[in-house]
Amino acid sequence: MKECKYKQYEPLFGSWYITDKIGEGANGQVYVIERHELGVVYKSALKAISIPGDKNEVKSVMSDGLTKSEATEYFRGLVQNFINEFIMMSKLKGNSHIVSYEDHMLIEHDNEIGWDILIRMELLTPLIDCTAESNLEEKEILKLGIDMCKALEF
């Protein structure tokens, strides 16, 4: 795995370590994290988001005429959106049809505008991997579709 800037915060959540990168999207990267206890290895997913995404994003916002203080407040608003998401995810915890939120860390950068948001979640096998490993029968496909619809009810 290439160098991961989030390793500087290890151990995460007191005892978790980043082991592999799963992927990335518009809102950040996703990693496998592990914790070892009494000979047992526990795994979770870590969604890592940096706000702003890079220094160019700060420059872009400030080039629109915002002061450093105003830019900080702008990005703080984006962070607040994620905090609201944590609250919602926490309320949905325990629903068998939705990925389980476990914990989060919100780390404000020193001496610059920025935050790192780390979200520990249940580690699941991607649907495409499940279907590639075995041919699903019609009954299994129907159950999967029903489960997805139940998740959307929330």
Outline where the language-model segments fall.
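Juxta-kinase regulatory segment immediately upstream of eukaryotic protein kinase catalytic domains
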Residues: M1-P11, T19-D20
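Protein kinase glycine-rich loop
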Residues: T19-A26, V30
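ATP-binding glycine-rich loop module of kinase domains
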Residues: H36-I83
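Structural motif at the C-terminus of the N-lobe alphaC helix and the adjacent alphaC-beta4 loop
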Residues: I87-S96
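Short beta-strand micro-motifs within the conserved protein kinase catalytic domain, predominantly
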Residues: S100-W115
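Structural motif in protein kinase domains
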Residues: E122-A132
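Activation segment signature within eukaryotic-like protein kinase domains
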Residues: L144-G145
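Protein kinase catalytic-loop region centered on the HRD/HxD motif
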Residues: K150-F154
